[in-house]
Amino acid sequence: MLKPLLSLTGGLITTMALGIAQAAPLSQEDVSVAEVLRDRALESSDAYSIVESLTVEVGPRRTGTEGDERAVAWAQDKMKAFGFDRVYTEQIEVPRWIRGHAHAEVISPFPQPLVVSSLGYGAATPAGGLTAEIIEFPDVQALLKAPASQVKGKIAFINKRMERARTGEGYGPAAQGRKLGMRAAAEKGAAAMLLRSVGTDSDRFAHTGMMSVDDVENPVPALALSAPDANLLEAMLQRGKPVQVKLDVETERLSDGPSFNVIGEITGREQPEEVMIIGAHLDSWDEGTGALDDGAGVAIVMETARLIAELPQRPRRTLRVVLFGAEEIGLVGAKQYVEAHVKELDNIIAVSESDFGAGKVWRFDTRLPESKFDIADQMMQLLAPLGIERGNNESYGGPDSSVFVARGVPAFGLYQDGTDYFDYHHTPNDTLDKVDPENLRQNVAAWVVMSFLTTEMEGDLGRVPTASE
């Protein structure tokens, strides 16, 4: 393998003095090839052109829309052009929804407009809108504990700020309000729900996102407020006077329809039935162009596979790129994929997903049996020069990947710097100019090391405890 690779790269492969024993799961030859792939990614990876193409030629890709359909066709064309051995789609059934207009304004005591966005699959107001008094809650837990008599007929305002962190760990607590707030408001007889946007910015853009809407008997309108408008509403309430807000929202829930997971494979040369899945999600919300969420991830995993496909011979095992559909509305594509392939899960040796923007990878986590830590240790010797540190063994691999991990599939997690990711997440500001080409190359360099070495290793990675164990 080394001799053909020498001619492919046009340069000398430096043998790495890693001190790796012959009994290790990765041969010195495999490590050397991975080193070359890593360096090629840093020097000449063209992942940026992939995300540029997706955002310019397709744009927003909300599930069940024409943009979603265009994205599926775009992804198939790209994979075929990149020389993947097999490109195909698998249909999934998805709920569909139309976003219409959303207007909000303070009527009294200080009339002012508010910048809002309908939350995903939310309800409309009656024709002509509705006007009601605001009642504020510091978080969704406070709303859940409030007596219905306190909430009935009012607009419940959940005013939970998200904390900024490189790990994005503030997202989960803040997103609980978006997930559960409308349901809680509806059950207590509220007229509507307003939510401080789940984000870390101070821009006057609202952050949309999905809610828990299934089985809500009488859903009410639910809107995200931009951070400055949430601050404004908070300041008005602090003056001690009742605050009346008018909402005028148009949405429509449609019948379920089709979407697709798009799949491309580099077929293994020796053990093609054994598969590593690297994934991203193809859908996006509709108010930006989905450059960070998850156009960058799409570009990273597609470019990773393209670089491996250019090698003189195929990897030992199959590398499968899965661009999941309908992630934004509840991991629908991943869940339906796992159910459709449940008998094949034992052949999936590992899974990983890129779905956290385009910041530099700074940490490498795993979800492996302890007996398999040696493979991660060997990978780290190639990842460390990229500025990546070893993390923990609690990775879920990414949102879609978590569905596989729950069934016992091992996972790798290449975690990106998310310090500013939630400034743009689910907003009109999620656009191509937020993607740094140099950071994208560093991502691909890390991904190609992890992906190639996993497909080439001796032995397997075993299984991890399932969600029920």
What are the functions of these language-model segments?
Residues 180, 201, 258-261, 284-375:
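Acidic/histidine-rich catalytic neighborhood of metal-dependent amide-processing enzymes
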Residues 7-19:
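Bacterial N-terminal signal peptides
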Residues 26-65, 205-210, 283, 354-359, ...:
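N-terminal capping segment at the start of a domain
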Residues 306, 310, 422-469:
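His/Asp/Glu-rich mid-to-C-terminal helical/loop segments that flank catalytic regions of hydrolases
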